[in-house]
């Protein structure tokens, strides 16, 4: 590694994972303009990953046990991940304000019930509405929910859209999520027409 090397469009993620020597992780940006899946090879409990970016992205780290963790990747940023394979909920991701916000949120909600985490997610989004961290939390707790709740999700979506009108990641997410939201629990059935067999 060359210490003075720096690319303004590259995000560097340095990681250490206790209680594991060799494993492969997968990283991808769901719903972004750059949907490729990369493999991160952890060797000796450590790894380095670089990703070229044109704009901030919310990345998903997929572990071998299929648990997921979100992080915000920004062009030119240097991010550090410190984890323990035996307790991934205590993972620390630091180096940028966005990822430190996500780490604080994860730690604060780790032992809460699903409903309590969802309520905490709503408050986090309102408190940090101009951040990519808020978009990440919205995606995790509302977009990826099996049964999104319209009365909870729609006001958050409206608030995020107003606060971040130029966020391409948010716009792409809206295109995919809005049809699901229109059919969510609590919504009216959309108007439609049907032609019978007899015309």
Language model features: what each stretch is:
Residues 127-131, 163-171:
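Short solvent-exposed coil/turn linkers within tandem alpha-helical repeat scaffolds
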Residues 4-128:
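A non-transmembrane, solvent-exposed segment enriched in polar/low-complexity residues
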Residues 130-141:
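Amphipathic alpha-helical repeat scaffolds of TPR domains
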Residues 171-199:
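N-terminal "domain-start" segment that seeds a small globular fold
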Residues 142-147:
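Short coil/turn linking the two alpha-helices of tandem helical-hairpin repeats
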């Amino acid at each position: 590694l060359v210490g003075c090397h720096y690319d303004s469009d590259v995000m560097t993620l340095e990681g250490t994972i206790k209680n594991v020597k060799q494993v492969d992780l997968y990283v991808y940006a769901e719903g972004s303009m750059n949907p490729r899946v990369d493999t991160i090879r952890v060797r000796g409990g450590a790894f380095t990953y670089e990703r070229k970016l044109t704009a901030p992205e919310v990345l998903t780290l997929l572990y071998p046990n299929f648990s997921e963790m979100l992080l915000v990747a920004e062009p030119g940023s240097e991010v550090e991940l410190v984890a323990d394979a035996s307790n991934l909920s205590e993972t620390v991701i630091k180096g940028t304000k966005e990822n430190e916000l996500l780490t604080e949120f994860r730690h604060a909600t780790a032992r809460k019930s699903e409903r309590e985490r969802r309520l905490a997610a709503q408050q986090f989004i309102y408190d940090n509405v101009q951040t990519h961290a808020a978009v990440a939390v919205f995606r995790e707790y509302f977009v990826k929910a099996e049964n999104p709740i319209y009365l909870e999700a729609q006001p958050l979506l409206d608030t995020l859209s107003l606060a971040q009108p130029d966020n391409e990641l948010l716009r792409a997410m809206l295109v995919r999520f809005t049809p699901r939201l229109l059919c969510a629990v609590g919504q009216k059935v959309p108007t439609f027409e049907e032609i019978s067999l007899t015309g």
